[in-house]
C-alpha cells in the first residue's frame, strides 16, 4: 500500500539524516523534541500552482517519554526555493514545543506564521546556536540529492492526512486516538518508524 511505502521512505530519510557523519540531527536535540515530522520527497507543485506538496508522518512524545504511533500528514504550499535541477527534497521537522504539535492536530498549521521555524543545527551535539535557532519553535532539516540544503519552509502548511490515517488505522480514526495509543493493529513499517525515533533519541 502507498501508505506503508510512505512510512518506509520516512524511516529511510530519518535514518540517513541521523547517520550523516557530523552533519546529522544532534541526538540531544531529538531527545528534547516534543514532535517530529518526516516528509520524504517534497516536490514542486508546478510553476502554475507554485509552492510544493508532500506527504509524510508525524509522531509526538507521549507523557511517558516514548514516541507515539505516527499519524500521516501532508505538507503543501510555501514558496520553497528549490535549487535549479532539484525536483524534490526530504524534510525533517523537529518541534521543540508541544504547542506546535497540538496546532497541527487541531487544524492547519502554517510554518513561520503559527510558529517560528529555522534551519536546525547539525553535528553530534547542538552547542553553538544562532539567535534565530534559539528563538525558533521548530527546527527544519532539508536534504536534496543526499546533501543538506538549508531551504526556507516559511509559508508551508502542515495538515493531518485523514484519508491515509483511516486507510491504515481504520475508519473514524483521529490523530488524537492515534497519539494516545488507542489503535489496534499497526502495520510493520509504522512500528519501524516509531522504533527508529526511539533509537535515535533514547533519553
Language-model region placement:
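Small-residue-enriched, tightly packed secondary-structure blocks
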Residues: 1-203
